């Protein structure tokens, strides 16, 4: 019995020495691009302008750049918007250009900000829009929903009429 115990002990000690411990590394954050948030505004803008102005860019890369730009908590500068619209036109993606303008409008936030910031951006890029033949969502009729009629007795608060500009519509009575 003693020899059996000695054999098991010897195997356990030998096995412990034979097993190599696995070196672990510290987990790295999946957000490697978060450093871009700390860039100065000019460097940030130039990164996207240079990326979107590449002549060999394809549709997937344009979508990737616009998606990445949308992920950051910024409203793009008109220079970046111009580069994005030109890239959309270069790959012949009219719908992406309109959706990009709509995303900028949504990122502007409340109606007050949309009236000032979004209007400023559209005014600045208007020559490029005309040159490329791209319409804004408002020109296409996407400024407000097609079949939306608020029903205040169900869920619509009366103060929202004024916030969203429905107090000026002739068919809606408060």
Curated annotation (Swiss-Prot):
Subcellular location: Mitochondrion inner membrane
Pfam families reported for this sequence: COX5A
Molecular function per GO: metal ion binding
Pathway(s) annotated for this protein in UniProt: Energy metabolism; oxidative phosphorylation
Top-level taxon in the UniProt lineage: Eukaryota
Function recorded in the entry: Component of the cytochrome c oxidase, the last enzyme in the mitochondrial electron transport chain which drives oxidative phosphorylation. The respiratory chain contains 3 multisubunit complexes succinate dehydrogenase (complex II, CII), ubiquinol-cytochrome c oxidoreductase (cytochrome b-c1 complex, complex III, CIII) and cytochrome c oxidase (complex IV, CIV), that cooperate to transfer electrons derived from NADH and succinate to molecular oxygen, creating an electrochemical gradient over the inner membrane that drives transmembrane transport and the ATP synthase.
Name of the encoding gene: cox-5A
Residues making up the signal peptide according to the UniProt record: none
Key word Heme present: yes
Keywords: Heme, Iron, Membrane, Metal-binding, Mitochondrion, Mitochondrion inner membrane, Transit peptide
Listed name of the protein: Cytochrome c oxidase subunit 5A, mitochondrial
Family: Belongs to the cytochrome c oxidase subunit 5A family.
Record note on quaternary structure: Component of the cytochrome c oxidase (complex IV, CIV), a multisubunit enzyme composed of a catalytic core of 3 subunits and several supernumerary subunits. The complex exists as a monomer or a dimer and forms supercomplexes (SCs) in the inner mitochondrial membrane with ubiquinol-cytochrome c oxidoreductase (cytochrome b-c1 complex, complex III, CIII).
């Amino acid at each position: 019995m003693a020899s059996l115990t000695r054999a098991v002990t010897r195997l356990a000690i030998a096995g412990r020495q034979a097993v190599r411990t696995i070196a672990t590394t510290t987990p790295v954050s999946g957000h490697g691009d978060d450093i871009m948030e700390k860039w100065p505004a000019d460097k940030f803008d130039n990164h996207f302008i240079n990326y979107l102005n590449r002549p060999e860019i394809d549709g997937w890369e344009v979508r990737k750049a616009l998606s990445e730009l949308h992920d950051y908590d910024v409203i793009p500068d008109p220079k970046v918007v111009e580069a994005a619209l030109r890239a959309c036109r270069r790959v012949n993606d009219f719908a992406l250009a309109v959706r990009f303008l709509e995303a900028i409008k949504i990122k502007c936030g409340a109606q007050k900000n949309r009236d000032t910031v979004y209007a400023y951006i559209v005014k600045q890029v208007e020559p490029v829009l005309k040159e490329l033949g791209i319409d804004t969502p408002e020109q296409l009729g996407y400024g407000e929903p097609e079949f939306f009629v608020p029903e205040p007795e169900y869920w619509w608060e009366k103060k929202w009429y004024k916030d969203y500009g429905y107090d000026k519509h002739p068919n809606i009575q408060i």
